[in-house]
Amino acid sequence: MSGPLSDATHGQPASAQTPPGRAASGRVAPEQAASARVVIAPDKFKGSLSAEEVAAHLARGLAAAVPGVVTDEIPVADGGDGTVDAALAAGYRRIDVEVSGPTGEPVTAAFALRGDVAGIAVAQACGLSRLPDGRLRPLTATSYGAGELLVAAANAGARHIVLGLGGSATTDGGSGLITALGGRLLDAAGRPLEPGGAALAGLRELDLTGRRDLSRLDVLLASDVDNPLLGPDGAAAIYGPQKGASAADIPVLEQGLARWAEVAETALDGDFRDLRGAGAAGGLGFAALAFLGAWMQPGIEVVLELVSFGARAAGASLVITGEGSLDKQTLRGKAPAGVALAARLASPGTPVVAVAGSCTLDEASLARAGIAGAYALSAVEPDLALSMTNAGPLLEKLAAQVAADWLRPLPDAPSA
């Protein structure tokens, strides 16, 4: 097969090396089909199904097609709002706490805890989905609730924090988070600043004398964003519009973030504004890197470690991953590429295939990502609205096709 994989051809797998115990086609050899073990590790299909739902439908389709197949469902995320769900599906305990939402109203947020490791998603507290009536508030949205989540996790015994930074509604540089930890942001008259990024332009003093001591916490930021805090590639310019910032709002937020960086530099005796990822989550990455001594790693890598993917994928017959759209972004550290790489390291020779709502990647691009075959819902149902509405049953159909291509025993060769 050559050239782009159109949606009409996505049911056909790309070429793959033949691992031990496989026929030359890449399918499970006849003697092993009955005991096939398939790891299912998809991200969410945005606007349609959660990662957990995607995994469940694929498992159901495989079980119907190949009775006796063993499946291990591992929903994943790339560091966004699915981080907590991925941890919960891996056996972490759910803890619900009341925190401040992005506009200050109380919301119930969850984090995941196992032993002294906690998985937190800032979107649980200050995400776009937490905005009342969905109304964007780019100038005043606050990350205060994310700080409250950190405190709650520390109080619950966490010492190692995985902090997913995707999906935030804020551009306050993480100033709300620092306020929740006991920092005081004061104006020229010594009064506390109003929340949000716009108010930061009036910042004159940062009082950290009452800040909670979280020095025992090891904070790992899960994010694919490597933007700096300021400038044309910074938090306001690049991500502000996604959070409702108008052309006139961008310089207001930029001015506020610049002032925040200046005052923080004086307080901490260090400049953190240009660190990789400082612009993540509206600048919350800056606050975590500067004030918490956090470090950053690509989101999917963090989540895969959180859910013990490597140990669970070792020796699998097949790995299935996926997300809503397989496109150029997939190749830049999104979940399917991350799963394929981790599977290759954990279980060399095990093929990885991907399912998606749509796919615009050609065979060569998929192969470079370590994906041996791609299957698109749009090949089964071209109507986008119907495809999203009926994504579950359609995924089960695709799973049957995957089983036919990769798990069905081959017919016995004719005798000589």
Where are these regions (language model features)?
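N-terminal loops that bind phosphate or other acidic moieties
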Residues: 2-11, 32-165, 169-416
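Long, intrinsically disordered low-complexity tandem-repeat segments
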Residues: 12-34
